[in-house]
Structures are given as structure tokens and as C-alpha cells.
């Protein structure tokens, strides 16, 4: 019989730990872990039970403490071999005892906290998982602090294991807060994970780049362009060390995508600033162009605008201008780019060393500098636009339509947004229309390529977007309609918009889209409710398009009647859906009710004997 000693127990546990870390072939994936279990159960626990009576009281207490540790390790081994219920029960059973000796066995206690926490998180027991991770984090910090205070010379193996557990805790926290939709805390722990991995210099480069690019996107959402830039530049450096060529190419394409979005979101921000300026300019133009008398299309008479009404209107415009100025100031306070304090004094990823960081940030491999300028006019907007477009096009070389349909379409829609942001800074009507047509050219060819059986949702998005673009073009032509030819061009844009809105709406009907799957009436209503926001907007926009048609009375009347029917159908639809859905669309309901009341009067007015002859053009 072997005389049981603490050193003997430690030796068996060390052998078991070594076995548990072995990576076995796919045919026998858990061979080493089962050997570790056998070592702990058959050899160690058996020896302890046989020698228990020969030990003094202190030895017995020490052995009991180690039995708790052995049980916790067994629980983790069973979890690792996918016997999760058994392993979880063992870990939970020994957790209370383990917490009582946590100062003696901090690493084992932390590891058990984490094992239970990640299972709870995977089962959506987020609060339980969160509390265990907090306990784990506190114990990690206490252990590090204790080491520093007492200047303990711990084994390197202990320090490495503690750092590894700290890294794992950061990673689990990042996952947890991601699932809880707390992007701020998730990003905080993601950053800590990335930095700890760089410090340890032992990490999967592919996963590191993925997480770093996710962090970059978070910083873009927070308008922190300086930190976003640091994330993708360091990812670009790390990416070069990915050994697998396919993985490296995919990661490089994702880096280009984030860089494209870097410029896209920057232009988006200044588009919003310009939009506030534009609102004020439009109000001023309207004020200057207002006539004192306005024609009422129903009564056919004149209505005077009193001085008090003008004063109220001016006060309203002044108030709006002041509100917009405050909004602009707040927005400009939020944005961060080209700030020395973030790029020099507080850079991310200092673990790489200042010399290497300087090389990465200031001497990157890209042909042109990755910099930003304040967007004030069309030339500066175009500069940002071209840089974003450049990186979108580079990413599309990897994310081709053949093989990456969803991602390719997503990139095209991002490019459409890019064109839209540029258009805000364009003052020439012809160039504005040209930009809109470029947007259509990007996505219209996809309608011939996509199979509705698999990509019906994408096809609907394309229908809706093209309809929206033609509607925007019609608004530009509407401002310059002075003769028959211009009115005809204006109407053609409206008719194109109607065509695509109808294609979108009809796609919810069985058999309307070629090769689309058959659906029942119940399935149709379900799909409408799933897309209710965009569906109701499409119907509303279609009704407005019909209402805005210009030309001879016969044509106008025909489209006014269609418009009226659509407004009424929207009311019927909103009355038929559940209350929680209809309550979100009270504004649309009110507008449709107003139109259902006003349009019959307009139709009657145009049809009455007072109207000009049938060949008369109506452009009101």
C-alpha cells in the first residue's frame, strides 16, 4: 500500500492535468481525458480512501480539501467529454466547499466558476452566469493583488495558468454582454481579451482579427474613428501571419470591408450635419418664395395668410433653426477623429510596443494614407466617397455573387448608402439624377440572377429600393416641370416607381414572382406581418405616387382613384392586424384617413363641369 502524501496527490493531479490538455485524434477525441478521469478516480481517490484511517486530524483535513479539488476537476473533465449534466452536477455539488477554500486553491475555484458560468450562459441563464463570472473576476483580482502585496515568488506555471484564466474570463464576459445586447461592456471585455492575447503572444490570428474587426465596428457606431482605425490597421498587420491562404484572403476582405465602412460612416455623419443645414436653407427658400395668396384646389378660391400667421411661422422656423444648431453642436462633440490624445497618448494595443505600433499606424502597406478630412462641400465629400468605394470594390473581389450571395448583396446596399450620402452634397440636379441612376445600375441586374426560392427576401429589398430611387428622381423632376416633355419625364419616373412598388407588394401574393414557392393565405398574412413596417410604407408610397401624377384630367383622375383605393386598403389592413402592430402606425392611419376624405373631393372637383376640357393638363 502506498503511503498517501500531499506531494503524491499533487503529482497525480499534475499528471491528470497534463492528460486533460492532450489533443487526441478525431477517431478517439476524448481518450486522454478519460485516462485523466481514471487516474483521479481509480488511483487517487481509491488510495485516499484506503489510507484515510492512518492519517492524523490535520492530514485528514488537508486530504479533504484536495478531495474537493479532485471532484471539481472530475466535473470539468466530464463537461469536456460532453457528459455535461453529470459534470455540471459534480461541479455544483462541490462549489460551496470549494468557495470555503478558495484562498488555498484559487485557480481551481476560478476554473469551476467559469465552467458552470459558460453552461448557464449557453442555457440562457444569463444572470446566474454573470454572477459566477463576477465572482471569478473578483478572485482573479484578489489573487493578483495578493501576489503583488506579499511579493510572492510563484511558479511560472501558476502565473501562466492565472493569466490564462483571466483571459478566459474576459472572453466569457464579452460573449455574455454580447448576448445581453450590451455593446459597450461586450466591447470593453473584447478589447481586454485582445490586449491580453497580444501580451501573452499566444493566440489564434484568425480569431484575433475577427474579434478586432468586431471591436472596430463598435467604435464606428460610437463615432470613435481613431480607435476603429487602430483596430483595422493592427488586424491588417496580424492578418499577414495567418498560415491558411483561404482564411487569410477572407480576413483581408473583411478588413477592406471595415475600412470601407470607416469612410462610409464618416460621410454618413457629415451627411446628417448637412441635412440639418439643408433644412434651414429649405425653410428660408420657402419663406422667400411664399405668395401671400394660395389657391385651394377644392374651393378654387383665394385664402389670405395673416400677418400673425406669418409671425408664428417665422417663430417656428427660428425655433427649428436653434434646435438644429444645438443638435449639430452635440453631434460634433461626439465624433472623434485625428485626435492626438487617442492616437499618441492613449493608443490601443500598446502590448505590441511603441516602435511597431508607429510602423503599423504611420507606415501602413496601403497605397494612400488612411486619413479623414472634415466634409464641408462636394469635393471633400467626393474624396471620402472615393476612398470608401475603393475598399468596397476590393472586398467584392473576394465576396463575389457566385458563392457569397448574401454578403455581396449587403455590400451593394452599403454602396447605395454611400451614393446617397454623397448626393446630399450635390447641388446640380443633373448630377443628382446621375447618382440615383448609378444606384439602380448596382442592384437591378441582380433580379435576373437571384432565385426567388432561396433569395425572395433579397429580391423584395431590391424591388423596394429601386422603387424608392425612382421616387426620389421624380421629386427632382417635379421641381422643374414647366412643359409637356418635362411632365412626361416626371411621370415616367413615377410609373417606374409604381412598377417596382407593385412588384414588391405582389411578391407577397402566391405565384406573382416567377419560380417563387407556393404559399397559403395564412402564410401570406404571416409574411406581411413579419415585414409590416416596410410593407405598409410601400403601400403608402405607391398611393402617393399615384396621387402625384400630372397630365390630362383623364390620366390624373385614373391615378387619383387608384390612390384613393390604396389609402382605403391601408386603413382596412391596419384595422385587421393586432393592436400592438396598428398602434405603431397611428400617423399613417391618420394620413390615410385624411386622404380618404380629401381625395373624393378632388376627384369630384376635376370631374365637375367647372374643370377645363378633357385635353387640359393638370399639374396642381
Swiss-Prot record:
Keywords: Coiled coil, Cytoplasm, Cytoskeleton
Disulfide bonds: none
Main location: cytoplasm
Coiled coil regions, renumbered to chain: 30-64, 133-169
Biological process terms in GO annotation: mitochondrion transport along microtubule
Cellular compartments per GO CC: cytoskeleton; mitochondrion
Location(s) in or outside the cell: Cytoplasm, Cytoskeleton
Job of this protein: Activator of KIF1B plus-end-directed microtubule motor activity. Required for organization of axonal microtubules, and axonal outgrowth and maintenance during peripheral and central nervous system development.
Family of the protein in this entry: Belongs to the KIF-binding protein family.
Protein name: KIF-binding protein
Organism annotation: Dictyostelium discoideum (Social amoeba)
Gene: kifbp
